[in-house]
A protein has these predicted regions:
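Basic, amphipathic alpha-helical/coil surface patches used to engage anionic, phosphate-bearing ligands
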Residues: 1-333
């Protein structure tokens, strides 16, 4: 969705129990099958209203949440991602807030004007495609090999992915129809592998599994060098079965577009209609549009010094806690 279609959003309140709640939220429109999509999410006006109230009451009384957005746009991320199950949505919110505290290098200062993030956006490291799929999915492209391992780390990659996620997660169609993630690994070298470790992959997977409020409809790796398959296998081995079942590897974009995606959606350089530069430009504009809102997220806070499942200790159990044992080569061809 081009940023010209959207109005700038005000910086939301972070008070856990504000005097007045922000109920403003756009309805998902533009899809022929939107009614069917909402039915799958178990979303009805009354259910939505009741769950928003329940989430807000829960946040206000939560012993560990100190500051958090309570506006409808934000809370609907979690409710829609978890098909309006209050229990699962609230657990996901706890882990989302905990991940923000534990991994500041991923989540803090999501500023497109930051020199490093700006450069990665300029070279096309990651960007969403302008057009959605027929089912309304937002599609993102990551050319992971463009990350210079002499200049950047895996943390920069994670930060760029979070930047994109936060820039689009209040979009009602993104919340309802979901996203498809495409990773072009054509330019990945041995040097790139040196900045990746199984422990980092496990932490990334833990956030995707438990704290990411997005409906992930597909994750695809294309042009994977043989030497980089351990990275793909490692990450996938840590993912929950539901997400793993939506993952696939393709030899090239010819094979990928024949089986999974309309090629016309891709940048012109991949055989589509619109030049890559136009997709990248729209992404930068979106990040500028939501810049203040994303920077305000840095003030959200949750206490992690306790024995709950989202404690600092529980969130940071490392590779020695069994990650190596669960790592195995998967047949992904």
């Amino acid at each position: 969705m081009a940023s010209s279609e959207q109005k700038p959003l005000p910086v939301p309140s972070l008070e856990k129990a504000p005097e007045k709640y922000d109920d403003e939220a756009e309805e998902p429109t533009g899809l022929a099958n939107i009614a069917e999509t909402l039915e799958k999410l178990r979303e009805e006006p009354l259910v939505r209203e009741q769950n928003l109230k329940q989430m807000r009451d829960w946040i206000a009384k939560h012993p560990h949440i100190r500051r958090c957005r309570t506006d409808a746009r934000f809370l609907l991320r979690f409710l829609r991602a978890k098909k309006h199950s209050f229990m699962v949505a609230s657990q996901t919110l706890e882990r989302y807030l905990a991940a923000r505290m534990i991994h500041p290098g991923w989540f803090q200062r999501l500023d497109i004007r930051d020199p490093e993030l700006s450069h990665l956006a300029d070279i096309g490291f990651i960007y969403p495609l302008l057009e959605r799929t027929a089912d309304g999915c937002k599609v993102t492209m990551t050319d992971w090999g463009l990350l210079d391992p002499k200049q950047y780390t895996i943390e920069h990659s994670n930060r760029m992915h979070i930047l994109l996620a936060e820039a689009y997660s209040d979009d009602p169609l993104v919340q309802c129809a979901g996203v498809i993630l495409i990773f072009d690994l054509k330019h990945v070298t041995l040097a790139h592998q040196s900045i990746v470790s199984l422990s980092v992959l496990k932490q990334v997977a833990k956030f995707i599994n438990n704290g990411l409020p997005l409906r992930c409809q597909g994750v695809y790796a294309v042009n994977v060098p043989a030497g980089a398959m351990w990275i793909v296998n490692g990450l996938v081995s840590f993912l929950h079965e539901k997400i793993r079942s939506r993952f696939a590897v393709f030899h090239d974009f010819d094979e990928f577009t024949k089986e999974r995606l309309d090629r016309q959606l891709l940048p012109k350089e991949y055989g589509g209609k619109v030049p890559k530069s136009e997709h990248m430009k729209a992404f930068r504009e979106q990040c500028e549009l939501y810049r203040d809102k994303m920077l305000a997220l840095d003030e959200m806070e949750i206490d992690l010094d306790h024995n709950e499942a989202y404690s600092r200790h529980a969130m940071l159990d490392d590779i020695e806690g069994g990650a190596v044992g669960s790592f195995r080569k998967l047949d992904l061809d």
